[in-house]
């Protein structure tokens, strides 16, 4: 790996709009054939390794989940040289092991979104790809995320099924009950089509889900407030710089 290569790219979700301890930061405005990404890509040094960061919802959280240009985000990260992408996704917990302030590295997902451009095989003349998506997150990269958590002492649930919903509204109790029956442990709004697009581009991709609240009808869930969400994300994210730094080592 050359000194100028990107060791790791991180996509930040709700409540994670910058990467703590990222030094010597350079800002890159990237154009792609699919339009502009959510915002500039910040590239800097984290614990001795070159790491890129992109805020999925834009700076100031200006983009709701269904308006994110997922294709441009993935293409932009690839264009700057990233080959490994760690996606930070703020989610709700459905099953008992996934309560607020839990970090999880899911191994499966179910897509409930609609109307989003979900492939790079869209324009006339583009190569048609039927990518294998049985394991939607890179198994080898997931194992490295889990190992990095152990090394840095970050408590992490290894596994779980992420259910991706359309948003931006939260789900009904009945919708969450259906998702539980389907086998979902977590619910979020940005897991797809991001994971599938990364697979089409040949990127190693894993999700680190930050549980901000109980989903509707689960746990001791009451009315969910944004203040509660951000507080729980902040608490659960305290060990992320060390985990990400360890992951960037290779």
From Swiss-Prot:
Organismal lineage: Bacteria, Pseudomonadati, Pseudomonadota, Gammaproteobacteria, Lysobacterales
Single GO MF descriptor: S-methyl-5-thioadenosine phosphorylase activity
Protein name per its UniProtKB record: Probable S-methyl-5'-thioinosine phosphorylase
Annotated function: Catalyzes the reversible phosphorylation of S-methyl-5'-thioinosine (MTI) to hypoxanthine and 5-methylthioribose-1-phosphate. Involved in the breakdown of S-methyl-5'-thioadenosine (MTA), a major by-product of polyamine biosynthesis. Catabolism of (MTA) occurs via deamination to MTI and phosphorolysis to hypoxanthine.
One Pfam match: PNP_UDP_1
Top EC class of this enzyme: transferase
Binding site for phosphate: 14, 56-57, 190
Catalytic function, reaction form: S-methyl-5'-thioinosine + phosphate = 5-(methylsulfanyl)-alpha-D-ribose 1-phosphate + hypoxanthine
Organism: Xanthomonas campestris pv. campestris (strain ATCC 33913 / DSM 3586 / NCPPB 528 / LMG 568 / P 25)
Domain of life (superkingdom): Bacteria
EC number(s) from the headed UniProt entry: 2.4.2.44
Site (Important for substrate specificity): 171, 226
Subunit composition and interactions: Homotrimer.
InterPro entries for this protein: MTAP, Nucleoside_phosphorylase_d, Nucleoside_phosphorylase_sf, Purine_phosphorylase-2_CS
PROSITE patterns the UniProt entry points to: PNP_MTAP_2
